[in-house]
Amino acid sequence: HQVNIARGGEWIETRLLSSGPRTNPWMAECSDRIIQAGDIVSFDTDLIGPYGYCTDISRGWVTPGKAPTNEQRDLHATAREMISYNIDLVKPGMTFRELADRAYQLSDEFIPNRYAVIAHGVGLADEYPAIRYAEDWDKYGYDGVIEANTVLSFESYAGRVGGHEGIKLENQVLITETGKEVLDTFSMDLIPE
């Protein structure tokens, strides 16, 4: 927060950091639990930074000291595949409903704990649109058109009900006339270099 303010930023909107069992389900604040070697550590941070623009990313890693378990690799692969699939799918002129209908389909074991939206707008804050899953469309969805020069944050969370851990990932993407540009460059690897 201090660095953001010193550089002309305004406020922190989200600051979730959790490890091990506190990563599942998502949205748990950090605690006094000491991070252990081999724990997943996940964070989600949004801030209104210099010039009044929002930055919103999430990452999850395995803490050094132990190799990732097969479960951790599976969770990470699911979350990463979902993000990649949905980013590859989006294009200008696509409706919100088309994205919802064609978006990555999580297996049933992940649906109860999934993140609330496939993607949401980013500009001066986390904002319109909030693109819901096809299963939630009748209750929460609304249609619109994804336009060129729109920034969307694509979200994913993979954590099983009753599972030990979960992985949260998020990328900001500029939708252009000719495609898209991922705006954040921080590694999405399970074990960052």
Q: Which positions does each model-derived feature cover?
A:
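Active-site neighborhoods and metal-handling regions in enzymes and metal-associated proteins
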Residues: 1-193
